[in-house]
């Protein structure tokens, strides 16, 4: 169904909002200022920051987004096609939730696919699929995506799926996973994508919570050196769970054995697609849930973030040019997993809404086949901008410190590298700049927000050479402030709670699935009138945010609040350590003292005792004796989630001899046993 009201005006990079306007940002000194780590008290927030640090267009946009959010986002929404105009741009009828584009109707699949074809862009490449684990490469045009998505929508409708029903997608990093997401969106079904290979128990919990009418899955996932059978994992999840979906739609991966189908329950993807009728887009209200995304490490009642359709479409389309500085048609690569929020926002919806080509990569930064993989993909596909996690960069650096494998590739089209997902230490940042030879920009956001909270908005003229260690300035719409526990605003460089003054902008979550009480309690009760990010950090005088750690990771040393992230950065800057996690170890005298778990670089010749002595001295010089840092242990590897995060709370429990739970998102759970052995010998 084609919208009849406000037809989309193609974003060409010259619109009033979202236009790339590079400006002339001032170049900042490369020196790393000593961190202000002990909490202080004063007052500062994004609203007050209008210093002369470059990016006049950014300042205008940010000020407008705070002063008149309805007008600001109403303008941005004109870049999206609507079936029915909204009656109110913003409404706070049910605080703390904010409704955007009230009573407006749209379809995000239409905006991501159909409208580009209607504008004559059907032959443009929508998806580049690059799978080193299967030695497969494919380019898929917008027309080809539409053909697959509209037929798959027809398959779902034939099985009784209708607007408001839920569908679980349990698939690897293949185009069919994106088709499934868009097909659900096309008919107004709510998808819940759970990354392939997720353990049966946790998969069962999510299926029971979301109660899907259909589960869409694949026969296998492929990891380096091994094949992951999805059906046994899914069968076990359904066996131990309460909810039984009506149908399983199974995609058998080519050149692999077919999985047997259960008569009356299972459907073969290819067979159903061959006889399917294409289905048109179904209009939905702006507040209609597009998807449910469960946050990693969920315990107790599942925490399923609900994403409203209209605001998400507006925000993602706006960010592609305003934050990432891209023009339609350019190639974009978010090196993440579709099962995480980055995959939802910036592998699937964001680039397609904006008319970009999105790279879908089924591989790893190293091991598929080597540490030159990222360079190959960037060169081969003419990628303009890459978004990855710092842990991926560290993995490349650890295996190839001089980036020798990357030197054979020409990166002539590559303009910018964005990192997020965890703090990017200065050492990793500087190495990335050196080997990729482009600006490397850290930015910060959360599953709940769906898009960046702070960033270097290069499309709005922000500096491409911000100070090391920062995570950008407030994205328009996000009025970030630093508060102490008594809701007092803190002065610049004082460590405190990072909060966002309400209302949240379009695209942020509208609730937790079947758990609105937890939504209110977790995020809005501690600081009334604000969204509690549960992260700790500080702002400098120029308005740059430094995200230091989760609030729970602030270590209380003899009454002083010390950021674990700051100590980690100091350890990494010494040059002998390639990865580090700092946790608080209980101490009878000081309450807690920091303990560093370190992974040494391959080329370090000194003994562990010598390295420890040097690191302790280095941390004392860069942070001061207040950190009380005296101990570290050396391990072969740190545990990481699939999105590259270190499970610090689990490590903290382990270090302190307490029971701990290994979440199903951990890539290699055996690392915990190794760390336990190291700690027994060292402490």
Swiss-Prot record:
This is Acyl-CoA synthetase short-chain family member 3, mitochondrial. One of its GO terms (biological process) is lipid metabolic process. Gene3D superfamilies: 3.30.300.30, N-terminal domain of ligase-like. It is found in: Mitochondrion matrix. The keyword Hydrolase does not apply. It comes from the Eukaryota. Its main location: mitochondrion. The keyword Mitochondrion applies. The gene is Acss3. The modification N6-succinyllysine is found at residue 514. Expressed in a wide range of tissues, with the highest levels observed in the liver followed by kidney. It catalyses: acetate + ATP + CoA = acetyl-CoA + AMP + diphosphate; propanoate + ATP + CoA = propanoyl-CoA + AMP + diphosphate; butanoate + ATP + CoA = butanoyl-CoA + AMP + diphosphate. Induction: Expression is up-regulated by fasting.
